[in-house]
Amino acid sequence: MNKALKGLGIITTIAMLFVLIGGALVTKTGSGMGCGRSWPLCNGSIFPALTLESIIEWSHRFVSGTSGVLVLALAIWTWKKIGHIRETKFLAVMSVVFLILQALLGAAAVVFGSSALIMALHFGISLISFASVLLLTLLVFEADSKQKSESFYIGKTMQFHMIGIIIYTYVVVYTGAYVRHTSSSLACLDFPMCSTENGWLPGKFHEWVQMGHRAAALLLFAWIIAAAVHAARQYKNQKRIYWGWMISLILIILQAASGIAVVYSRLDLGFALAHAFFISCLFGILCYFLLLVARYRRQVQK
């Protein structure tokens, strides 16, 4: 397989990660209006004034635009080069369509303004584009290996975990994005409960938003542990499934730890960006599991 195509896949995947982290940086630093109501220009000019907010917002737009070109190039190239692989064309379309959607949503928020409910979708839409690019890149590397042609087994319980967890993870991601866009990150200053001084249950809207996300994340944490234990017991000989769940377990632990650190560090930017990074990586792996389930079901039907 063309080494240049593999290189493009890796670069595009990393670029999309920067888009996700950059979006989180914009939100965490309150830089969403750093370029005013102007788009694609920044305060009516190509280059922004030298303020922190405008530089962060302009940089995010620049990285997103560059990533858009890379995603389009990867989609076209993989379509031509490995279009015979069943998932390629679907993923190519998904990567481009959802990247355009997230760009339009971001632009609309700048020009017209938007509610927290709508803006919380921005990160989730970007996640789908990132996962599509990641899977496209994996297909490129897979085309040179024998893994795709190997038969494998996924039982009903594991299929339930793989499908259920990816859907539920997307819900949890939305609640986390809603926490950011409603400025609820520090609504509860203790952990695991909201406050040991004013009672353990939340009393205000922002506290309910924060605790709702924590409750949803706790269930996801427990579910991934259960799936990882099942994989360790039943799928140790199937490396993709076994190691996929082991890595997912590590990522969800890091995700939880960074979330707790955000609270106790009083919104340290490094921990906040790590929180976005870990969930992005986890979502990518879970989407790969979804790909495996689809392949297994086709394998059974043959």
Swiss-Prot record:
Molecular function per GO: metal ion binding; oxidoreductase activity, acting on NAD(P)H, heme protein as acceptor
EC number assigned by the record: 1.17.99.9
Compartments in which it is found: Cell membrane
Active site per the UniProt annotation: E57
Disulfide bonds: C35-C42, C188-C194
Binding, heme o: H60, H122
Catalytic reactions of this protein: Fe(II)-heme o + 2 A + H2O = Fe(II)-heme a + 2 AH2
Record Pfam families: COX15-CtaA
Residues engaged in binding heme b: H213, H275
Required cofactor names: heme b
Membrane topology recorded in Swiss-Prot or TrEMBL: Multi-pass membrane protein
Superkingdom assignment: Bacteria
Keyword Transmembrane: yes
The protein's annotated pathway: Porphyrin-containing compound metabolism; heme A biosynthesis; heme A from heme O: step 1/1
Cytoplasmic side stretches: 1-6, 83-91, 142-158, 230-242, 294-302
Gene Ontology biological-process entries: heme A biosynthetic process
Chain segments annotated as coiled-coil in the UniProt record: none
Extracellular side, ranges: 28-61, 113-120, 180-208, 264-272
Keywords in alphabetical order: Cell membrane, Disulfide bond, Heme biosynthesis, Iron, Membrane, Metal-binding, Oxidoreductase, Transmembrane, Transmembrane helix
HAMAP family: HemeA_synth_type1 (MF_01664)
Described function: Catalyzes the conversion of heme O to heme A by two successive hydroxylations of the methyl group at C8. The first hydroxylation forms heme I, the second hydroxylation results in an unstable dihydroxymethyl group, which spontaneously dehydrates, resulting in the formyl group of heme A.
Similarity comment: family membership: Belongs to the COX15/CtaA family. Type 1 subfamily.
Subunit-level organization: Interacts with CtaB.
Protein name: Heme A synthase
Natural source organism: Bacillus licheniformis (strain ATCC 14580 / DSM 13 / JCM 2505 / CCUG 7422 / NBRC 12200 / NCIMB 9375 / NCTC 10341 / NRRL NRS-1264 / Gibson 46)
Gene name of the encoded protein: ctaA
